Amino acid sequence: MKERVTQRFLKYVAVDTQSDEASDTFPSTEKQKVLAKMLVEELRRMGVPQVEIDEQYGYVYAKILSNRPDGEKVPVLGFIAHMDTSPEVSGAGVK
């Protein structure tokens, strides 16, 4: 499993998601949408039933249901991350 996770993250960092400070769109570059769409497809392949991409801002939302018995109270967990990289440094060729 560790190797699968490592390979998945290496695939993500290889996507050039450099942002553009001069842009007035969200996300600031089309390249960032490539990663968003990749994440949506991977989550769906993993069996996550509720996955969507916000077409206006490029946000990816996924709801992973609890595998705990019905009615068992457990804390809610959220993952939040940027999909873009700094406009100051190229995002191309990352390995």
List each model region and its residues.
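Acidic/His- and Gly-rich active-site-bordering loop/insert found
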Residues: 2-95
